[in-house]
Amino acid sequence: MEPSKQSLGPEAVVRAYYADISAGRFADAIARLAPDATTWILGEGHWPLGGYHDLASLGEIHAMVAERFPEGLRLTIDAVTVEGERVAVEAESYGVRADGKVYCNQYHYLIIVRDGLICDRREYLDTIHAKELLCDPMD
């Protein structure tokens, strides 16, 4: 049984969030975010996913990922640095899209955790590769 969310430290909250994402447990991942949490993705104004997202638009992104990657999109955490409520994560994703194309991207996340919930998440990634595999039409 998992400890209550508020008893988890910032690193444990972040690791649990990305474990949920990797396992396709998107509702569980969203539950680890504060109700007013924001996510910012690099590339605002330059591709459809760039910019700020609330929980509703993040849910739409999760639905799109589930549709495009029916066998899941695995996220592997390579390194974590924690300073107070700030958690920096280096990670890599891997997934095979429904049409057989492979998506593998590198990320840096900067995450703020307060009271056991993620309040702010900033995502840096290769936006060209992400747009091609996440947003462009499938073959």
List each language-model region with its residue ranges.
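Hydrophobic pocket/interface hotspot
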Residues: 14-17, 29-30, 37, 58, ...
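A beta-strand edge to alpha-helix "cap/lid" segment located at domain peripheries
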Residues: 1-6, 63-139
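Short, low-complexity N-terminal intrinsically disordered segments enriched in polar/charged residues
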Residues: 1-32, 138-139
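A generic alpha-helix structural signal
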Residues: 14, 18, 59-65, 134
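A solvent-exposed, acidic/Ser-Thr-rich amphipathic alpha-helical stretch
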Residues: 34-83
